[in-house]
Amino acid sequence: MSEKYTNEKYVVTWDMFHMHARKLAERLLPASQWKGIIAVSRGGLFPAAVLARELSIRHVETVCISSYDHDEQGELKVLHAAQTDGEGFIVVDDLVDTGNTAKEIRKMYPKAKFVTVFAKPAGTPLVDDYVIDIPQETWIEQPWDLGITFVPPLARK
């Protein structure tokens, strides 16, 4: 079902992310079964764009749930919700971690297919499909959260 990775930090490049998101799109074929995509903002916006392109889906909604402030998980707040029960929709997020957000998503969209690119053990039972297994204690650095910076050559240190 998925690939495994173990380490304290997992740095995802844009190329890796795109490859994994396309793999997820392949699993969602045929595209004709879907009415649209619901992206879990903000992390789900990136895989939603790839899925929308690969599956030729134009109807993209969002559900905006706030739970993280950089690396700290806090209280869930639903800021905006797509108005559907999810039937015929793919709900996509970048990651399922503790499962707190996923539980709320399942309540809101019980008939949707819920997928993520990455999954940690606590959240795995709550999604219908995912691409990469990540250990619970591993922090994922997503490419949209990173910047490119100069690193001096080792010989100069």
Curated annotation (Swiss-Prot):
The protein's annotated pathway: Purine metabolism; GMP biosynthesis via salvage pathway; GMP from guanine: step 1/1; Purine metabolism; XMP biosynthesis via salvage pathway; XMP from xanthine: step 1/1
Molecular functions (GO terms): guanine phosphoribosyltransferase activity; hypoxanthine phosphoribosyltransferase activity; magnesium ion binding; xanthine phosphoribosyltransferase activity
List of residues binding Mg(2+): D94
E.C. designation(s): 2.4.2.-, 2.4.2.22
Matching InterPro entries: PRibTrfase_dom, PRTase-like, Xanthine_Guanine_PRibTrfase
Topology within the bilayer: Peripheral membrane protein
GO BP annotations, alphabetical order: GMP salvage; IMP salvage; purine ribonucleoside salvage; XMP salvage
Binding-site list for 5-phospho-alpha-D-ribose 1-diphosphate: R42, G43, D93, D94, L95, V96, D97, T98, G99, N100, T101
Annotated xanthine binding sites: D97, I140
Keyword Membrane: yes
Residues binding guanine, per UniProt: D97, I140
CC annotations in GO: cytosol; plasma membrane
Alphabetized Pfam families for the sequence: Pribosyltran
Known cofactor(s): Mg(2+)
Subcellular location: Cell inner membrane
Alphabetically ordered keywords of this record: Cell inner membrane, Cell membrane, Glycosyltransferase, Magnesium, Membrane, Metal-binding, Purine salvage, Transferase
Binding site residues for GMP: D97, T98, G99, N100, T101, W139, I140
Reactions it catalyzes: GMP + diphosphate = guanine + 5-phospho-alpha-D-ribose 1-diphosphate; XMP + diphosphate = xanthine + 5-phospho-alpha-D-ribose 1-diphosphate; IMP + diphosphate = hypoxanthine + 5-phospho-alpha-D-ribose 1-diphosphate
Quaternary assembly: Homotetramer.
Function: Purine salvage pathway enzyme that catalyzes the transfer of the ribosyl-5-phosphate group from 5-phospho-alpha-D-ribose 1-diphosphate (PRPP) to the N9 position of the 6-oxopurines guanine and xanthine to form the corresponding ribonucleotides GMP (guanosine 5'-monophosphate) and XMP (xanthosine 5'-monophosphate), with the release of PPi. To a lesser extent, also acts on hypoxanthine.
Family: Belongs to the purine/pyrimidine phosphoribosyltransferase family. XGPT subfamily.
PANTHER family with a match to the protein in the record: XANTHINE PHOSPHORIBOSYLTRANSFERASE, XANTHINE-GUANINE PHOSPHORIBOSYLTRANSFERASE
Protein name as catalogued: Xanthine-guanine phosphoribosyltransferase
Organism encoding this protein: Actinobacillus pleuropneumoniae serotype 5b (strain L20)
Gene expressing this chain: gpt
